[in-house]
Amino acid sequence: MKLIHAPFIVAFLSSALAAPLSISLGEQDWTKQEWDAIVVGSGPAGIIVADKLSEAGKKTLLLEGGGKSYGITGGTEKPDWLAGTNMSRVDIPGLYKSIFSDPGDLTCGSTVNAFGGCTIGGSSAVNAGMFFQPPSSDWDTYHPDGWKNADLEDATARLLSRQATVTDYSADGNYYLQTGYEAAKKWLVDGAGYSNVVINDQPHDKTKVFGRPAYDYNKGQRGGPVTTYLQTSLSRSNFLLQSGVRVQRVERTGSKATGVVATFDGTTVTIPLSSNGRVVLSGGAIQSPQLLMMSGIGDPATLSQLASSNLIPTSLNPSAWINNTAVGAGLFDNPNTFIELTGPSIASYTYSYKSPITSDTLMYLSSKSGPYTFASQTSVFWTTIPHSDGTPATGVQGTIDSAGYGDFVDDRTITLNVYGTSGLLSSGRVVIDSKGVAGPSDDIYYSDAAGRDASDIATFIHDLFQALPGSGLTPLNIPANATKEEIQTYITTPSQYAKGQVNHWSSSCRIGSCVDAEALRVKGTDNVHVVDGSVVAPLTVNPQFGIMVAAEKGGELIAKL
């Protein structure tokens, strides 16, 4: 269960978050002030949107349900070996995996029926930090006019000027834990004909390419929008970040939002908008649709079910509902399969939160070098599976990790994580249970009637296995000589290696159907917007970069209204 953080208020601070606002809360109660923009959720999109709106002169309130994360936000969760530093566990890339065994106060816990970050920075504070620019085909094929690749070039350039992509993350210039990388390169480049490239130097090529992962790190520490966009926002007198606030719904009169209803410090409050104010929902692809539904905006059938469970206030009777059947529809996550690989040249490495190798922590603390400067992924690769019917190809991705998983964790084992990405046909929707907790429906993965998604991913794995001889690698949980049909059965049968949640949630309030292309305004409303992973279609790459581009563009459009 998620613990409740002590309220954390930040405004008008230096980039080091040194001191709170000198005016006391009693003299200037933020819950009673009128705001030009209320942004709900301080994840990778919400932080960027709030920065854009405050930069444009809007009086901007950024609300976060969780609490402190990075050391720069006042986060203090850390192992003993970080004692005496200004870093928290969040700052250390090599502690990324510890979130799954001990999430502390950083994840959403029982407030969402899925794994995700509920803290300042959202999931960008708890994920691996992989940072890949989507290929132009993602925007040109799956997004409407106004959101094609050419329309997003300026937003992409602005993002890269604030948040660089990094492949040389260790300060000493060395790469660590490379036995898996070398084995994968021999397998894929020498054996399977993949090109060895710098992935983000040629972002639009995702057919048979192999390379090192790109991350959003900065000088050996986790980067992301908390370390960049949030810091410029905090320097402005018209911006306030307030954590420990659980927004329940948008308060509205007809199609116009007038504020948000939230719980803060045990009290329910209504935070008002100014006469021309706007609400921007940036809680992620599960929670933003949930907030819309709880506000009486969505599919009438779903709203009726929520009303019958007393989850929608009686003041929002059916005549006040806004019919938008695209709210919560199309929820996407990457179907994944873990393939355990062993070989005589492999030396696996397991990161430790409490008892790491002393020389590795000393290297990190003294010079920001060594294994703890990255999150364990040593190589990444993509290709595409074409279709004879002329429909877009399916994107598929593989990532090599430094250690084994599940029942295969000896010191000669590493993990290949296989994803299906763009072009897949399967998706589900956001559902809300009887307690009002949102999560994914049970048809997210491999639910297309013809079984094409499973066939494409099985084809990818089968093709990879044909190049295994000579690589020195042997798969442990799937036979190297498995047929495509056997592989397809394996990947679609739930196990600790297959059909699990990757938690790359997106696409549940898409541009064009759920929100408009002009300003990401929720259809049927005047001044409610969604800017987060909900609005983008499934991407070929890990979604954080694309979500941040959408936030750059969306923030720009909303600021002009």
PLM feature spans:
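Glycine-rich loop(s) and the adjacent beta-strand/alpha-helix scaffold that form part
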Residues: 52-55, 59, 66-71, 250, ...
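N-terminal Rossmann-like FAD-binding beta1-loop-alpha1 element of flavoenzymes
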Residues: 34-62
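A conserved FAD-binding loop/helix module that cradles the flavin
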Residues: 538-554
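A glycine-rich dinucleotide-binding beta-alpha-beta segment and adjacent secondary-structure elements
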Residues: 243, 248-253, 466, 470-539
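FAD cofactor-binding and catalytic pocket of flavoenzymes
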Residues: 324, 335-456, 499-507, 513-518, ...
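Fungal secretory targeting signals
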Residues: 1-25, 280, 532, 561
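Conserved redox-cofactor binding core of oxidoreductases
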Residues: 125, 136-249, 257
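N-terminal FAD cofactor-binding segment of flavoenzymes
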Residues: 55-61, 65-121, 142, 147-151, ...
